[in-house]
From Swiss-Prot:
The gene is PSR2. Residues 79-670 are annotated as: 7 X 93 AA tandem repeats. Disruption phenotype: Exhibits significantly decreased virulence when infecting soybean seedlings. This is RxLR effector protein PSR2. The lineage of its organism: Eukaryota, Sar, Stramenopiles, Oomycota, Peronosporales. One of its GO terms (cellular component) is host cell.
Length: 670
């Protein structure tokens, strides 16, 4: 028993050295101090006072007192020697040391190394000691829990050695019990770890056992990737590895397993179509490209092509075996809106467009497939529009196409009225990110109008400017129209059109005249309105409108009262003067129009009233003189004129004017 005591003392000395506070010096082993081993300890004699009788005087060993103090208030060295002398089973000592109360913190307890040392002292070999310890631990902990504790203990320098020995012994027992790696995968509940499996502390223990099992059972070898696939499926494993690649701690392992997964598929002869289904990508929907499994699948196609050059394929070709254009295109459209999938989607869409061009798929069909027909007023902010415009350009490059398709043709068919398209352009021009596409669509629209419409006036109507009314000059569509008109006139010298032409097409004479008069009152539109008023006069002249007719068109016949102060009358008068300047031989007289419209009495009364207003007195006097001259030419007798004058003017005024008329009449007719 003397050797056993020496071993125990030496082991405890090592424990003391390992777990002592910094100020406690290391206690040397018995061998280092040449402890005499003269005879075995007698059973039942405790260490201490009778040490010398045993041949081992522990009290005289340097460091003994420090070791004894370190073990307080734990069972002292003497008690341990007594237990060893009495051949107390390690399991009993485990309980005496209250290690059965430590739970999963067993390896952190300072009494655990004491127990380990005790067990080693009573065992014949290290291997036997490990087996005895494991037996004790297995009776208290499940394989899963104990393996986790051992894995944690291996990370500490204080417990690494004993934990490694326990793990080795644990695996020997599993092998003896014919437990497969798959059995232990379930025991460790790694089948439920999900995305955390690669960071699980139990994975290391399982991997070690797998390697040991493979060595012992070469005909039943397995791998981590094969076992994971069995429990999680190809799709689940791919998802786990994608998540693991994002963590620095598991990134390298994930990459290695991905490579193994690919090799596993190749070994099993999986085709890209097979793996597409295995990874559940056929059920991914619009999020297909965002699926972690999609990247795995694309990589597999590359490996597959290298291994099978005669069956070389592409990602798009394989996608088209699972989706038609109506299904795949929306998936790519969605993916191009997401930064993480935009690049991949762009490449696939470019390849898709090539296929469409080869199949002579029309721009109209492409417009619908790209879901641009559902964009509404957000068409110009849709990122797919640029791609579609490029496709349309490439489509028109095909020399076999009989008739080219312009973008604006498709737009107009989709949106029906040009005003909606124009409003979208106007809105997009205000946003920096869409200014370029807005300019492009604007050019397409202008080009389309020039080709399709007969004249610019049609554009005014197409933009529905005839419905705006007196605020037309403040409408963004008016500016859009005038911009087109300017470009049209520049491109068609000699065929220039005026702004008034479209206005006259959309509004009648009186409405347009009143609109211009209203616009002249606002500082922001005064200059434009004045210019347009002059253009309107010229437009009427070109249309050869007779002053009398225009007088009616302008609704001036409604009332003679205050007509000389009516702004519309002044516009008519401007036209009358312009008309007479253009036809000097046969001039139209204002008085004739007034007489025709209101009659002698009404005109006479109006002139009498107008002469009383300083603002119209002068023109009224001129018109009154013209009226008298007209009556003379009509051979109205002074009596007839007297009757007319008496209805409106005062007696004195009538008498004076009648005298003037009588003199004129006498001079002309005698």
């Amino acid at each position: 028993m003397r050797l056993q005591c020496v071993v125990l003392f030496a082991a405890l000395t090592l424990v003391a050295a390992t777990h002592a506070p910094p100020n406690v010096k290391t206690v040397l082993s018995a061998e280092q101090h040449d402890i005499p081993v003269k005879r075995l300890l007698r059973p039942g004699n405790p260490a201490g006072k009778e040490d010398e009788e045993r041949g081992i005087n522990f009290s005289s060993v340097p460091g003994f007192e420090k070791l004894a103090n370190l073990l307080k208030p734990k069972p002292g060295l003497k008690k341990l020697l007594k237990w060893a002398d009495a051949k107390k089973p390690p399991e009993t000592v485990f309980t005496r040391l209250r290690l059965d109360k430590t739970g999963t913190q067993l390896f952190d307890n300072t009494d655990f190394p004491v127990w380990a040392a005790y067990t080693r002292s009573v065992a014949q070999t290290d291997s036997e000691a490990s087996a005895v310890m494991l037996k004790t631990l297995v009776s208290r902990y499940s394989d899963e829990v104990l393996s986790g504790m051992i894995a944690a203990a291996k990370k500490s320098s204080k417990t690494e050695s004993i934990a490694t020995k326990l793990e080795t012994e644990q695996m020997r027992t599993w092998l003896a019990a014919k437990k497969t790696p798959d059995d232990m995968f379930l025991v460790f509940k790694l089948n439920k770890a999900g995305d955390d499996i690669l960071s699980s502390p139990l994975l290391s223990a399982w991997t070690n056992y797998m390697k040991l099992s493979n060595k012992e059972n070469p005909k039943a070898q397995t791998t981590l990737i094969a076992t994971m696939t069995k429990h999680y499926g190809d799709s689940g494993v791919s998802q786990i590895l994608a998540a693991a690649r994002k963590s620095p701690a598991t990134q390298s392992t994930a990459k290695r397993l991905e490579a193994e997964q690919v090799q596993l598929w190749l070994k099993k002869g999986r085709t890209p179509d097979d793996t597409f289904t295995l990874l559940s990508l056929d059920r991914a929907g619009d999020d297909l490209l965002a699926s972690p499994q999609f990247n795995t699948w694309m990589k597999y196609i590359n490996y597959y092509n290298k291994e099978n050059p005669d069956e070389k394929t592409t990602v798009l070709a394989k996608l088209m075996t699972h989706f038609d254009d109506e299904e795949l295109t929306p998936i790519l459209v969605v993916a191009r809106k997401v930064p993480s999938t935009e690049s991949t989607a762009a490449k696939l869409q470019a390849e898709q467009f090539k296929n469409w061009l080869s199949a002579d798929k029309s721009p109209e069909e492409a417009f619908t497939l790209l879901q641009l027909d559902k964009a509404g007023d957000d068409l110009l902010t849709n990122p797919q529009l640029t791609n579609w415009l490029k496709y349309t350009e490439n489509f028109n490059l095909n020399k076999e196409i009989n008739e080219q398709v312009t973008a604006i043709q498709v737009f107009r068919a989709q949106y029906v009225d040009d005003s909606r398209i124009a409003n979208m352009v106007i809105a997009a021009e205000k946003v920096p990110n869409t200014q370029a596409i807005a300019k492009r669509v604007e050019d397409e629209l202008f080009k389309g109008w020039t080709v399709v419409l007969n004249k610019p006036d049609d554009v005014f109507i197409n933009l529905k400017l005839e419905t705006v009314g007196e605020n037309v000059f403040e409408s963004p569509l008016w500016s859009f129209y005038t911009k087109f008109l300017e470009k049209y006139n520049t491109a068609n010298p000699g065929k220039e059109q005026t702004m008034i032409s479209g206005l006259a097409r959309g509004y009648n004479d009186v409405t347009l005249t009143n609109m211009l008069l209203k616009a002249k009152e606002a500082p922001s539109t005064k200059t434009l309105a004045t210019k347009l008023e002059d253009e309107l006069v010229q437009y009427w002249l070109a249309d050869k409108k007779l002053p009398d007719k225009l007088f009616g068109y302008l609704e001036l016949k409604e009332s003679v009262d205050g007509i000389l102060t009516n702004p519309v009358f002044n516009v008519w008068l401007k036209y009358l003067n312009a008309f007479n300047d253009k036809a000097p031989v046969k001039k139209a007289l204002m008085i004739d129009t007034l007489k025709s419209a209101f009659g002698d009495v009404a005109v006479s009364n109006m002139l009498f009233a107008a002469k009383k207003d300083p603002g119209t007195a002068k023109v009224a006097a001129t018109l009154q003189t013209a009226l008298l001259s007209k009556w003379v030419l009509e051979k109205k007798t002074p009596g007839q004129v007297s009757a007319i004058l008496k209805e409106g003017a005062g007696a004195d005024v009538s008498a004076k004017l009648l005298a003037t008329y009588s003199a004129k009449f006498k001079v002309r007719w005698g």
